[in-house]
């Protein structure tokens, strides 16, 4: 590097470009070489050298910038001196960042290229890039050094550009439907809003433990109480739990709340959102995900947990799954652990989650979740043991969870107290830390009146996986959580 410092400013910052590569391709790809010569299009571009072909007194390079790639051509006669030409071909390497000025032309094969008249080294790459054609063979390096993955893997860059577009389109859709975007705290006094183990931190000034949020739900419903009627938030949640191809401890979630609707209205709204996203992002409503074709044009399938069990497990259709002993036997057959204290409704849910859910391919809303595992959801008018709740499953995985909100402060207080009691008497750490604590402040807020409301949470990372055909959540998170080296 000292050699370059002596010969020029080591890291110049005075080069300015007037195009990026995709703008040139969009504007001039259809032109013939004769037309380009007549137009005499002068361009300034900057980017990273991705390939080099040295051919004696003339050379080619591929330059990659934020818009894509474009070919560069230069000869010994284009340089200020022969010394400059040989300096370029001998000391400029793949990975270096350069700026060039020149005119557009087309090669004999019809490729749009820049005939370079001026070239300047902007930043020297002091480390060799991975082989562009083989990429990063070490998967951990791909995630740990994402910048390298983005440099050599155009598919990764495309994925994260699509992710950004998806979030932009979600916001556009929400604003078109008159929802207001809000922000709620990332650090909570108590962990609430979902059943999950939190990350704990400590506030030195306040001399107290705080918790990275596991869900923003209670704060968002306080805003509905305050008078907002249609709100959403896109932000991070943190759960101190497992890491898997579908789980990252830090993940992006969108939560939506609307007053004066119920969970059935929310199903229709989510269906419209997903159909709009597939059409605007992928220009089609039937998309490919692995070996599956997922149809977002049709209304979402809707079935209860019991209906899903009977549909996806045809071998047990002759069995009476309203008999709790029969369900225990079915779980035992599938080697699914169970507890003899569980209710029939919870046994159904466990059987569904462990065996049935992975069989659901087309967008399907599963309903009739037990109230005992839905502490913030309203009870069904038809069955007090069942919540007005749905979960959206696509390609074998949960993508969203929504329900009609519980707005009875006495009922909510009793549910909080019941879980707090279970927390005190339960010696299992995992279960202990996943029980929802008693949130006195939320009960006070409910006593001022929460209108009939429905809400839904949608996992943005899993949604991006669907729309980019990725099967590991780490492929759609720029810097996923990894073990320290």
Swiss-Prot record:
Name the residues that bind Mg(2+) 1.
391, 398
Q: Which PROSITE patterns does the UniProt entry name for this protein?
A: AA_TRNA_LIGASE_II (PS50862)
> By its UniProt entry, which Pfam families does this protein fall under?
tRNA-synt_2, tRNA_anti-codon
Instruction: Provide the cofactor list for this protein.
Output: Mg(2+)
Instruction: Output the Gene Ontology cellular-component terms.
Output: cytosol
Q: List the GO biological process terms.
A: lysyl-tRNA aminoacylation
Subcellular location per UniProt equals:
Cytoplasm
The residues that the entry says bind Mg(2+) 2 are 398
Catalytic activity as recorded in UniProt: tRNA(Lys) + L-lysine + ATP = L-lysyl-tRNA(Lys) + AMP + diphosphate
Q: Which family does it belong to?
A: Belongs to the class-II aminoacyl-tRNA synthetase family.
Q: Which PANTHER family match?
A: LYSINE--TRNA LIGASE, CHLOROPLASTIC_MITOCHONDRIAL, LYSYL-TRNA SYNTHETASE
Q: Kindly provide the name given to this protein in its UniProt entry.
A: Lysine--tRNA ligase
Organism encoding this protein: Blochmanniella floridana
Task: From the UniProt record, report the name of the gene that encodes this protein.
Answer: lysS
């Amino acid at each position: 590097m000292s050699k370059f410092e002596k010969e020029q400013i080591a890291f110049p910052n005075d080069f300015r470009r007037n195009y990026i590569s995709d703008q040139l391709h969009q504007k001039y790809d259809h032109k013939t070489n004769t037309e380009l010569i007549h137009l005499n299009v002068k361009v300034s571009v900057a980017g990273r050298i991705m390939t080099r072909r040295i051919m004696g007194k003339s050379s080619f390079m591929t330059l990659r910038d934020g818009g894509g790639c474009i070919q560069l051509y230069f000869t010994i006669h284009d340089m200020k001196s022969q010394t400059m030409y040989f300096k370029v071909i001998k000391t400029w390497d793949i990975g270096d960042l350069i700026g060039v000025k020149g005119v557009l032309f087309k090669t004999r094969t019809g490729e749009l290229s820049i005939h370079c008249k001026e070239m300047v080294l902007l930043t020297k790459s002091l480390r060799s890039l991975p082989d562009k054609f083989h990429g990063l063979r070490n998967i951990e390096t791909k995630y740990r050094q994402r910048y390298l993955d983005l440099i050599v893997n155009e598919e990764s860059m495309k994925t994260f550009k699509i992710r950004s577009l998806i979030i932009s389109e979600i916001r556009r859709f929400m604003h078109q439907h008159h929802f207001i975007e809000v922000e709620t705290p990332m650090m909570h006094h108590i962990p609430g809003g979902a059943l999950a183990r939190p990350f704990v931190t400590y506030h030195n000034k306040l001399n107290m433990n705080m918790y990275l949020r596991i869900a923003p739900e209670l704060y968002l419903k306080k805003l509905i109480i305050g008078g907002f009627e249609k709100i959403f938030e896109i932000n991070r949640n943190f759960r101190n739990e497992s890491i898997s191809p579908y789980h990252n401890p830090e993940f992006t979630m969108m939560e939506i709340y609307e007053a004066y609707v119920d969970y059935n209205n929310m199903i229709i709204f989510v269906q419209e959102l997903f159909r709009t996203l597939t059409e605007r992002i992928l220009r089609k409503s039937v998309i490919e995900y692995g070996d599956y074709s997922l149809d977002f044009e049709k209304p979402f399938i809707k079935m209860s947990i019991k209906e899903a069990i009977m549909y996806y497990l045809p071998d047990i259709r002759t069995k009476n799954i309203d008999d709790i002993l029969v369900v225990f036997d079915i779980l035992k057959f599938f080697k699914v652990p169970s507890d003899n204290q569980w209710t029939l409704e919870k046994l159904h849910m466990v059987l569904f989650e462990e065996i049935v859910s992975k069989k659901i391919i087309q967008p399907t809303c599963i309903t009739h979740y037990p109230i005992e595992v839905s502490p913030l959801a309203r009870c069904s008018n038809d069955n007090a043991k069942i919540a007005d709740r749905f979960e959206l499953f696509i390609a074998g995985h949960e993508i969203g969870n929504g329900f009609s909100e519980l707005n009875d402060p006495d009922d909510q207080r009793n549910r909080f107290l019941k879980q707090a009691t279970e927390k005190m008497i339960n010696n299992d750490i995992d279960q202990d830390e996943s029980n929802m604590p008693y949130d006195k402040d939320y009960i006070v807020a409910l006593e001022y009146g929460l209108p009939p409301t429905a809400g839904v949470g949608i996992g943005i990372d899993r949604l991006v996986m669907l729309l980019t055909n990725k099967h590991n959540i780490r492929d759609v998170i720029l810097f996923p959580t990894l073990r320290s080296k």
